[in-house]
Amino acid sequence: MTPAPFGRSRGGECCPGITLLELVIIVAIVATLAGICIPAYDKYRNNTRIAQAILDIRTIEHDLLIQEGFNGNFPDDLSEVGKGDLRDPWGNYYQYYNTATKKSKGHGGGQRWDKLAKPLNTDFDLYSMGRDGKSKPKLDAKESLDDIVRGLNGQYLGLASEF
């Protein structure tokens, strides 16, 4: 018995396989699913990073409040509470500003302002510059919208765009 030529069965009919049209349809379905899943996954990852930054800021805030309880004032630098080299989930240093002494050594920005040009906090400012790694003093600036900020002396902690 001789083998059948390539692509043909012994009866002269074609072997079952995938046509070019079927392959194009499969590729289109996979591309559509990827187009839906990748942005959803990116949003999930960003929300996870925001939650981690909020947790980090609460932890640093707790350490700063303990320091203030012992010394009667807040430190001028996060390294005084052992958090000077702590980075946010996007790889940037957390920003700290002591509003009482108007000082910020190391990784610190200036005082932050809300959309009505009022100071965010009266004790200290502590925030992450967010996903873009940029920030401006006013929360409604484009560079500040993704910042994770502490406001109202700790009563608010979340995205600057939602403050």
Which ranges hold each PLM region?
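N-terminal single-pass transmembrane signal-anchor helix
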Residues: 14-45
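Aliphatic-rich helix starts adjacent to a transmembrane/signal segment
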Residues: 40-57
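Extracellular/periplasmic head regions of type IV pilus-like filament subunits
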Residues: 59-116, 120-122, 163
